[in-house]
Amino acid sequence: MLFCPIVEARVVCTSALRLHGAEGAIPLSAKNLGELMLKPIRWNTFIRDFFVIQIGFLLYGLAIALIVRANLGTGTWLVLEVALANLLEIKIGTMTVYMGFMVLILALILREQVGWGTLANILSIGPWLNLFLDFISTSKENPALQIGMFLLGVLIQGMATAIYIGVDAGAGPRDSLMLAVHRTTGVSIRVARGAIEVIVVLIGWLLGGPAGIGTVAFALLIGPSVQWAFKLFKVHLHKPELAEAAAD
């Protein structure tokens, strides 16, 4: 059987799969495949980690709600999610949950490792988003307020990202897909992320999603916001590819 140490699962198992395909000498069991794809849970810190990660997801939902209500344009994935939510006549947060599961399935098909935090990400951010959208009003006629809400949303999203990634319980579904594309195609993180987001925002825009100047501003500002938050909370990334993704 193929044994894959979890810490280096992505590198070791990918290499072993190539050897299996070339030489037919290394069988891969369903159990080991599960170990490859599922990040182990640290039970001794699980309660603390769960509490901290939920704070991150609460802030993430607040950040997205502020950006949506600023009415200047949203982040790339939200352009598509808002468009689909309008077409299906469901809440944006609910569509965020559905989209998270669809993206997760793609990442799993590409054999990307996920953790309990990945599932918590999908199930938690959407409900928080729906809650905050019910309480925050749309701003359309006060440019100063719109810009302020947008910038505050970007700042809070950077903090939320640093908090939940700092727990190290698994990347979100969209980051998992990005890493899977990077690993399976050999393209850089920047190219993988850029290609995915261009496709997503184009489809969302064609479906009537809220692409605008805020979409461009978000793309330019979210990287510095996340980097600042990483330094603020002293978050250290153990995987080089995640460090590069956070910097983008």
Regions found by a protein language model. Give the residues of each.
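Core subunits and conserved enzymes of cellular information-processing
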Residues: N32-D248
